[in-house]
Amino acid sequence: MLGQFQPHLAKSILGKGDSEMPGVLDIKWSPDMLNGSPAFGLVNSVGMAELYVLNNSAEVKVTKLLGVNLGENVLGLSLDWSNRINKSTTPQLTTSSSDGCVQIHQLTQGELTPVCSWKAHDYEAWITAFDNWNTNVVYSGGDDCRLKGWDLRQNSTSPVFSSKRHEMGVCSIQSCPIREYLLCTGSYDEHLLVWDGRQMKQPLADLRVGGGVWRVKWHPRHARLILTATMYNGYHVVDAQHSTDGKMAVIHHYDEDVSLGYGADWCYSDSYDNLIATCSFYNHALQLWQFTMISHDVG
């Protein structure tokens, strides 16, 4: 169902925060305040990784804090923060780019300092993500159909694992913020996989959702729920409670006003449980919707 909101207020806030910039391919809020202000990172179509803060004032104002170039003639494709579990005022960021590279950056004293960069994939490195529970480990997925894991304490030229379980490009990865070792991945092959990070030879569970799985998001409070942005097949809420037994099921499918589902996330507020924001590409649409879990959905 569509939620009931105050559209005039939402429009006003968004309008004050508008900023002209190149195409943004990924954007994520910082789990912690930066200099006492909410902040987010993004990567864009001119190969920049940038950090922005929201000014603490009566009006929402977005200010660019800093930026770093990911390389010549590349697109920035994804980013992730290291401080979702272990809070830090000096977190690391991992980014990926269209030349197949993955980068690590350290945020200290208002500077985003490059730590390392390596060629992770033969083609576009669509996605990179930290292991939320062990941020020495970084995952990456590429258009070469490979899902890889990297230990930052070792030589980053050699992955600790390289999986060909997905049959097409790997474009989404997220480490579960609620249960250690759980990892979900999505691919153009239309499959959502859940893994145990300690044993990456085979996934725990495999579910075909009928569209390229461009983004995956674990629920911030319920480890059983995964949200997918499924490109030409809308958005799905998946029950993964029994994924360790090889079972997953779609419990909600949203496909209203969707041209190409590219973005999706849960609301983190306890006041709006199961409130979801999604966005589609060609029609420039932002959707806000909720679903209601009933007992047989998650039995």
Question: Predicted segment positions?
Answer:
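Conserved strand-to-loop turn within each blade of WD40 beta-propeller repeats
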Residues: V43-V46, S96-D99, S140-D144, L152, ...
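Solenoidal tandem-repeat scaffolds enriched in leucines and small polar residues
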Residues: L79-M168
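Structured C-terminal portions of repeat-based eukaryotic scaffold domains
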Residues: T157-G299
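WD40 beta-propeller blade core
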Residues: E50, Q103, C116, K148-W150, ...
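WD40/WD-repeat beta-propeller blade N-cap
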Residues: H8-L25, G67-L77, W118-A125, S163-V170, ...
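Asp-box/WD-like beta-propeller blade repeats and closely related beta-sheet repeat scaffolds
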Residues: M21-V24, G47-S88, T113-S117
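Loop/turn segments within WD40 beta-propeller blades
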Residues: K28-S37, D80-T90, T128-T135, Q174-Y181, ...
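Beta-propeller domains
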Residues: M1-D18, L54-T63
